[in-house]
Amino acid sequence: LGDVYKRQANNQDELKNLFHKSIRLIGTWAVSLFIIAQLIATPLATLFVGYDQGLFELTRSGFRLYSFTFLINGFNIYGSAFFTALNNGLLSALISFLRTLVFQMAVVLLLPLLLGINGVWCSVAIAELLTLCVTGTFIVLKRNTYHYL
């Protein structure tokens, strides 16, 4: 991706093509992983904590809630890598910093107060969703600079 932008700066069609293919691929994998996670939640929980019904229910429920993260996080990882490839380390670092520290810390402290134990399980997905808003904003704001949309 970086080579397409730097060395072949006039090849905006290829940059757009790579961007759109990447988004489709990430979306396909995200949905696939989410569906697989939902389907294997019961067998996986049984394998690890099948000996305790209460712990089994908590684990299965938690895994199903956490799996919503799989729908989102690939786009954020790609967004950070995308801006790195375009030689915009500042936006890449900002996305990563917000994703891994600021948003996760904020929601893991706040959501359990509002949702109890489910808030803990949902905190990563909510942090990823907040990061997706930031990533999407940067992608829209920089579209005319890099011409990938």
Describe the residue ranges of each PLM region.
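Mature extracytoplasmic/luminal segments of secretory-pathway proteins
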Residues: L1-G2, A93
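Short alpha-helical transmembrane segments in multi-pass integral membrane proteins
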Residues: D3-F68, L110-L149
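Membrane-interface junctions at transmembrane-helix termini in multi-pass inner-membrane proteins
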Residues: A9, F70-F97
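Short hydrophobic/aromatic segments of transmembrane alpha-helices and their interfaces
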Residues: G27-W29, N73-F75, L86, V102-F103, ...
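Hydrophobic alpha-helical transmembrane bundles that constitute the permease/transmembrane domains
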Residues: F34, L71-Y78, F97-A106, A125, ...
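A short pocket-lining beta-strand/turn micro-motif at the edge of beta-sheets
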Residues: G89-L91, L101, V107, N118
